[in-house]
Curated annotation (Swiss-Prot):
SUPFAM superfamilies reported for this sequence: Translation proteins SH3-like domain
GO terms, molecular function: structural constituent of ribosome
Listed Gene3D superfamilies: 2.30.30.790
Cytoplasm is among the record's keywords: no
GO biological process terms, semicolon-separated: translation
Cellular component aspect of the GO annotation: cytosolic large ribosomal subunit
Protein name per UniProt: Large ribosomal subunit protein bL19
The organism of origin for this protein: Prochlorococcus marinus subsp. pastoris (strain CCMP1986 / NIES-2087 / MED4)
Main function: This protein is located at the 30S-50S ribosomal subunit interface and may play a role in the structure and function of the aminoacyl-tRNA binding site.
Gene: rplS
Family per similarity comment: Belongs to the bacterial ribosomal protein bL19 family.
Length: 160
């Protein structure tokens, strides 16, 4: 009889544990649903846009400074094929921030200066690598447009 009583008591305890577990999960789901509902009702159009932009940002971008020599891998679609074309040059300007951040890269191709503006978080930019750091004292290096030959070189910086 004592054994039956112990078994009955254990059975009641396990039933209590099971009901307690289901009750807590139900409460948690209700709380989660309540928080989600509150969060959904508080989202305005500007908050939705900010959240969407935050999701679109690339996570693994190197620190880029004006004066750096960078190699940008640009996706190019030719017919059905897609390939990555490297573009290497000196960063002469940085603009904006967040999702719309751009860099202007200048290089000399066959004696002619070529500048391209890249949106850093664009899907067209496949890769971005800093080849060497440049030592400059300006935020914009537009004066390089007027220089020819060796005068367009930027001194190398070793501390970054």
């Amino acid at each position: 009889m004592i054994i039956e009583h112990k078994m009955a008591k254990e059975k009641q305890e396990t039933e209590l544990e099971i009901t307690n577990e289901t009750d807590t999960t139900t409460e948690l789901t209700v709380e989660k649903q309540g928080k989600e509902l509150i969060a959904q009702t508080n989202l305005s159009s500007s908050n939705l846009i900010k959240e969407f932009e935050r999701e679109q940002l690339k996570k693994q971008l190197p620190e880029i400074y004006v004066g750096d020599t960078v190699k940008v891998g640009v996706k190019i679609t030719e017919g059905n094929k897609e390939r990555v074309q490297p573009y290497e040059g000196v960063v002469i300007a940085k603009r904006h921030g967040g999702l719309h951040q751009t860099i202007t890269v200048r290089r000399i191709f066959q004696g002619i200066g070529v500048e391209r503006v890249f949106m850093l978080h664009s899907p067209q930019v496949a890769s971005l690598k800093v080849e060497r750091r440049g030592k400059v004292r300006r935020a914009k290096l537009f004066y390089l447009r007027d220089r020819v030959g060796k005068a367009t070189r930027v001194k190398q910086r070793f501390d970054r």
